[in-house]
Regions:
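Acidic, His- and aromatic-enriched active-site or binding-groove loops in soluble protein domains
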Residues: 123-148
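Short, solvent-exposed beta-strand edge segments and adjacent coil->beta transition regions
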Residues: 77-80, 150-154
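Active-site phosphate-binding/coordination module
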Residues: 23-127
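Short hydrophobic/aromatic-rich motifs at helix boundaries and adjacent loops
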Residues: 2-5, 22-26, 65-68, 138-142
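Asp-based phosphoryl-transfer active-site loop
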Residues: 2-21, 93
Length: 154
């Protein structure tokens, strides 16, 4: 019955569309193309930022993108939903993270246009799929954020 009513297929990247080697199989791309030919929209929903998904988005060309854990929704090239923390809120969270977790806690922040990090080890050396990230110590961060993540590790 869903064949006649399905209008959108929505997929995660990591662990779903991406194989263990962080690639999308030719078979998957072929099936998604067939779905498109039947008028079904293809969407990606990921906790990754848009910037850290570009290598896959350029290959998939999704009609709909839900990124940064739902903080950003894009239909085609238009952002239709954006839930950002203000610069003041973002800096308050950075300050609180350092108070609670210590000054050397590892932080990543997603904005609409970039992915920022202060990791001791460049994440691109661990996983090439993370795309272009910008290193900062967050001491003078002046952007609204979509997400702020802490790696407090052992």
């Amino acid at each position: 019955m869903w064949k006649n009513t399905c209008k959108l297929l929505l997929f995660d990247l990591d662990g779903t569309l991406l194989q263990s080697d962080k690639t999308i199989s030719k078979r998957t791309l072929s099936v998604l193309k067939q779905c498109r030919e039947k008028g079904i929209l293809i969407g990606v929903s990921t906790s990754r930022s848009e910037q850290n998904s570009l290598v896959y988005l350029n290959e998939l060309m999704p009609d709909i993108l839900i990124s940064s854990g739902g903080a950003l929704v894009k239909y085609g090239t238009e952002y239709i939903y954006k839930a950002e923390f203000s610069v003041t809120e973002t800096n308050a969270m950075i300050d609180m993270a350092r108070i609670v977790c210590g000054n050397d806690c590892e932080i990543t922040i997603d904005t609409t246009d970039a992915h920022y990090w202060n990791y001791k080890v460049d994440p691109k050396k661990l996983d090439q799929s993370w795309g272009d990230s910008i290193y900062t110590d967050f001491s003078d961060f002046t952007e609204c954020s979509l997400t702020l993540n802490l790696d407090i590790g052992p």
